[in-house]
């Protein structure tokens, strides 16, 4: 929360308004609460556990057999019974364990790149939805100003009609224009409502808990160098996921 000093020297901390969200807050909500992203995060942990398990030796088998425990006479009970204990350990030959571990490690990398790809998709969706809300808010605001101007113009024309300076048809035209602005306002408010729902759905809320968003349409960021863009294009998680998926399929063939 932002803080500033009062004139008396005390520090005042301004609390964030939960009803007004920024792009940063919207992104944080989506990364923390998006159900699809959470599912991919769980898949990552499952793959990590499988990779760890595949690197371990299979659990040994323990068998205990008791013979002649149900005899008769002097052989009744466990006094004359024979107990056999067998311990078995599976030993995999032909590099099977190493191949299985490699396949699981590659599958873990696929899950990791899938998560990164989905994370980028969510970030893109949040940014687009946020811009739609901000744009819809501005449209509502501009339409409100048009209605205010149209109302003033309608009243002004009415006064001129009363004074006999213009024909009554002019006030009728002004009324039609004002009605058109009001219809546009209804459409703008509906678009804003839909945009707010779309944004809140990126973090799993069917109905938005916020009232408005705040941001700057006209903030200009420096253009990155072409070399850095080329490197990022090669290192995208989408391409890396595709490569890892090819390796995973080959590893599964080797495992068979």
Language model segments and positions:
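Periplasmic alpha-helical coiled-coil/stalk elements that build and connect Gram-negative outer-membrane
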Residues: 6-7, 21, 118-240, 245
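Short beta->alpha connector loops
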Residues: 44-46, 67-70, 247
């Amino acid at each position: 929360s932002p803080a500033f000093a009062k004139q008396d020297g005390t520090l005042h901390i301004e609390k964030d308004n939960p009803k007004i969200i920024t792009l940063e807050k919207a992104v944080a909500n989506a990364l923390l609460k998006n159900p699809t992203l959470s599912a991919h995060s769980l898949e990552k942990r499952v793959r990590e556990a499988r990779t760890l398990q595949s690197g371990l030796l299979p659990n040994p088998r323990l068998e205990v057999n008791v013979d002649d425990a149900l005899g008769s006479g002097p052989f009744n009970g466990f006094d004359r019974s024979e107990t056999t204990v067998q311990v078995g350990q599976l030993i995999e030959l032909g590099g099977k364990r190493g191949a299985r571990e490699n396949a699981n490690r590659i599958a873990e990398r696929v899950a990791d790149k899938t998560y990164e790809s989905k994370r980028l998709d969510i970030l893109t969706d949040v940014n687009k939805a946020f811009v739609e809300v901000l744009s819809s808010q501005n449209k509502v605001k501009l339409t409100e100003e048009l209605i205010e101007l149209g109302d003033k113009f309608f009243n002004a024309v009415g006064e001129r009609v009363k004074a006999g300076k213009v024909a009554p048809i002019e006030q009728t035209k002004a009324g039609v224009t004002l009605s058109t602005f009001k219809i546009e306002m209804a459409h703008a408010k509906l678009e804003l409502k839909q945009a707010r729902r779309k944004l809140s759905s990126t973090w799993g809320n069917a109905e938005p808990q916020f009232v408005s968003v705040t941001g700057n349409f006209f903030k200009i960021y420096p253009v990155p160098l072409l070399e850095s863009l080329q490197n990022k294009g090669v290192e995208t998680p989408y391409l890396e996921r595709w490569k890892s998926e090819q390796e995973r399929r080959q590893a599964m063939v080797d495992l068979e």
